[in-house]
Amino acid sequence: MRVVLIVLDSVGIGEMPDAHLYGDEGSNTIVNTAKAVGGLHLPNMAKLGLGNLDDIPGVEPVKPAEGIYGKMMEKSPGKDTTTGHWEIAGVILKKPFDLFPNGFPKELIEEFERRTGRKVIGNKPASGTEIIKELGPIHEKTGALIVYTSADSVFQIAAKKEIVPVEELYRYCKIARELLDEMGYKVARVIARPFTGEWPNYVRTPERKDFSLEPEGKTLLDVLTENGIPVYGVGKIADIFAGRGVTENYKTKDNNDGIDKTISLMKEKNHDCLIFTNLVDFDTKYGHRNDPVSYARALEEFDVRLPEIIQNLKEDDVLFITADHGCDPTTPSTDHSREMVPLLGYGGRLKKDVYVGIRETFADLGQTIADIFGVPPLENGTSFKNLIWE
């Protein structure tokens, strides 16, 4: 038996009860995107029950639905990729990741400069493409590293590969990771951001690399691999979990490549396993850029390919589709939004047309997957296997 778990990165379905604490009242990524484009055409997700979860223009409720459907609330504080994926896998954060709206503390930067032997410029929240345009010429002259953050818990280092070779940049990222951990700063990811080209037309290269914090507890991935069930990551899964519990990981260029790689794994791996896929374009390419038209198109493109995924399920396989947070492209904010996420499920062993309700934590999904595989339970979450299993 195989479980295929697909995370549509940032595809939220309505504000959490505490959204006002995050400045996210009124956010509803799917519904507001549908309104902005005069309706979404998502017939395949509609068949599974998506339209039964909210009033989504263009996506009709279907009775009886062919799948199981519900929504999940986030129990952890935060609204980022790491927090969301860890919680899906059973780890609930007690304390949110540290954010640096005014840049990183002086003593941290000074120690980083000492250990790397290079000066730091920037040290503020910024868009990655803007800051290299602003500071690239100084970096080229002096060899100083461009350090910046964002609305997420990230320490990003940008350098031109002709000035700082990529392997050297990775070494500086490892230094930053060790230093943050030593000094007790809880930063989700240190990210290497190499670029090339000439000012003002610098381009970022594909050698981006994430140095993630390890999950703060045992995840579904750890429990499965410890019990001899491999986990195949597609997209940035290995980065999110700092490589822990991921048997093999397949990097992706874009959503379609992620779907292709997921289907290849379904064709190739005929043993019990978890295929865990993150499709990130919704978030990085369209949500943060407040582009509801392209966001809608990406949702429709995924929906067109959903039947291919379903055709490659064997009789006892299970498919789950969910998200990790919101990123409403119609609100003034370009940041993530604190939202509930949709949950859709389908498989030969699952009942049809079952509403699993609004789950209190994303961890209910991880716990259910552990239950389906018959491995020891996770620390958090309540399994709903009994509601959905034939």
From Swiss-Prot:
GO terms for molecular function: magnesium ion binding; manganese ion binding; phosphopentomutase activity. Mn(2+) 2 binds at D283, H288, H336. Transmembrane segments: none annotated. Binds 2 manganese ions. Pathway: Carbohydrate degradation; 2-deoxy-D-ribose 1-phosphate degradation; D-glyceraldehyde 3-phosphate and acetaldehyde from 2-deoxy-alpha-D-ribose 1-phosphate: step 1/2. Keywords: Cytoplasm, Isomerase, Manganese, Metal-binding. Its cofactor is Mn(2+). Mn(2+) 1 binds at D9, D324, H325. One of its GO terms (biological process) is nucleotide metabolic process. It catalyses: 2-deoxy-alpha-D-ribose 1-phosphate = 2-deoxy-D-ribose 5-phosphate; alpha-D-ribose 1-phosphate = D-ribose 5-phosphate. GO terms for cellular component: cytosol. Disulfide bonds: none annotated. It is found in: Cytoplasm. CDD domains: PPM (cd16009). Pfam families: Metalloenzyme. Belongs to the phosphopentomutase family. This is Phosphopentomutase.
